[in-house]
Amino acid sequence: MSKLSLSSLDKSKLEGKKVLVRVDFNVPLNDDGQITDDTRIRAAIPTIKYLINNSAKVILAAHFGRPKGKVNERMRLTPIAARLSEILGKKVNLTESCIGEEALEKSNNLNNGDVLLLENVRFYEEEEKNDLNFAKNLAAHADMYVNDAFGAAHRAHASTQGVTKFLEPSVAGFLLEKELKYLQGAIDAPNRPLAAIVGGSKVSSKIGVLDSLLDKCDKIIIGGGMIFTFYKARGLDVGKSLVEEDKLELARNLEEKAKTKGVELLLPSDVVLANEFSPTAESKVSQIDSISGDWMGLDIGPQSIKVFQNALAECKTIIWNGPMGVFEFDKFAEGTNSIATTLADLSSFSEVCTIIGGGDSVAAVEKAGLAEKMSHISTGGGASLELLEGKNLPGVAALNEN
């Protein structure tokens, strides 16, 4: 990686220093305000522990939810500070605001190895506007900056980009470094054949990724609701399945581009249909050319699963972004679960590099209990997509060069 990393800073450079660390603690909470999945908090632990062990004073900046620039009591970081304290086995104090006298007093009074969490940076509208004055006030807490928030690295915000103008050095944390190594590596210098599995309900949200992957992949497998836009573009009847009518031409162009580039583009040959969008719907398997009027496709079929598994078995690097069907309904989760199991097996027994690129695929892999078996699980939804699209991430671009 061409960016300066935290690993290049040892105790002599960190001891007694106040280090502002941007983390991604945007975790899901239930109605009682309890954290239901602490993956993102755990992902930042190696960076935080490294700083503690090297006697730095750790000041964490994070956002939570979308408070739209106002204080929202339900979006305070209180449960996150509590969970982080449990994981670290030490008290993590929370400020009342991320900037201002109270927060500065707390950061100035830290001892070596202490950890302080600044209250939600998005309580200020200046955060998302990348306001330089606000960034300067955030930077006033610290001597140097670490960005470990891959999930927010595609945003040019005050806490991801603006602060780097005031803090030197500004370096990548261990999580950010690992994300770039796997995702950038898979795109720039993969072990081939390279396959991408792209799922999800809408072509529109994956256009950039599909277009970019066609320049880089040997095979692309498409699943999820977006397949019906491709079928409709081919002139097939798709019943009541989800279709983006304004993207038919685009679907045709993508298939055409794949042919021109010699990329093997695989779409399902059979699907699981439902008579309504419900976990208890009646279901049946159908070939794609015989989908009947009142039915809708909610998963890929058994024949397609086998074809996809055989295609993936020939690959050395696989990137997966987006589910194969409505995996939230058990009846329509078979396609997604089969792909997850296939990747876990290829990773474990055939040394295939498997990268789960953010969003719903991660949820599916976690739900199946297979996360540990994958080479890399990305913590960033939008950031993963933008990186796979070949875009520059502002939060990464702003860091010091190695």
Swiss-Prot record:
The entry marks the following residues as binding substrate, namely D24, F25, N26, R40, H63, F64, G65, R66, R122, R155
Keyword ATP-binding part of the UniProt annotation: yes
Picking any one GO biological process from the record gives:
glycolytic process
Q: Which InterPro entries match?
A: Phosphoglycerate_kinase, Phosphoglycerate_kinase_CS, Phosphoglycerate_kinase_N, Phosphoglycerate_kinase_sf
- Chief localization class? cytoplasm
Q: Which UniProt keywords apply?
A: ATP-binding, Cytoplasm, Glycolysis, Kinase, Nucleotide-binding, Transferase
Could you tell me what reaction this enzyme catalyses?
A: (2R)-3-phosphoglycerate + ATP = (2R)-3-phospho-glyceroyl phosphate + ADP
Task: Spell out the subunit comment.
Answer: Monomer.
PANTHER family with a match to the protein in the record? PHOSPHOGLYCERATE KINASE, PHOSPHOGLYCERATE KINASE 1, CHLOROPLASTIC-RELATED
Q: What is this protein called?
A: Phosphoglycerate kinase
Which species is this record about?
Prochlorococcus marinus (strain MIT 9515)
Q: Which gene encodes it?
A: pgk
